[in-house]
Amino acid sequence: MFLIFLVTESGEDKMSTNGYGPGMARAASHAESWYSSNPKELDREISRWLDAAGDRVGMARAIVSPHAGYSYCGDTAAHAFKQIVPENVDRVFVLEPSHVVCLNGCALTTCSKYRTPLGDLHVDMEGSSLKFETRT
C-alpha cells in the first residue's frame, strides 16, 4: 500500500485521493531518470549494491531509506534493505513526502498497482480503503 503522511499543525487528519481508479496502474514516472528502465540492468545494479552491503546484521521491522536517484543513494539504501528477511514480511507500507503538491494531511493512492521495470507492485486495496474510511 502506498501512503503519504503529513502531520497538520491543527492536528486534524485530512485525506485525499490521487485521481487513479481501481484497476488502474501508475506508470514508473522516474524510470530512466532516477533509475534504469531496463529490467536486466536495474536488477544487476540492485544486486551489486545488495552484495556490497555485506551480511545482514539484524532483522528490520521498519526501514528509513533515502529515495533519490539510485546513482546517489542505491548503495546506502541497500544497507537498509539488506536487513529485510523477505519470508517474514506480510505487508509493506511506503511513506514519503509529496514532491509535487503541498498537502494538509495525507494522500492515499486509488490505483491498484505501480508499474516498475522489474514488474508490477500490487496495492493492498482493502487495506487502503479501510485506512481511508477510518481517516487514521
Describe the residue ranges of each PLM region.
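Intrinsic disorder/low-structure terminal segments
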Residues: M1-I4, K113
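Bacterial Sec-dependent signal peptides at the C-terminal "C-region" and cleavage site
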Residues: L3-T17
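Active-site histidine-anchored catalytic micro-motif
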Residues: N18-T136
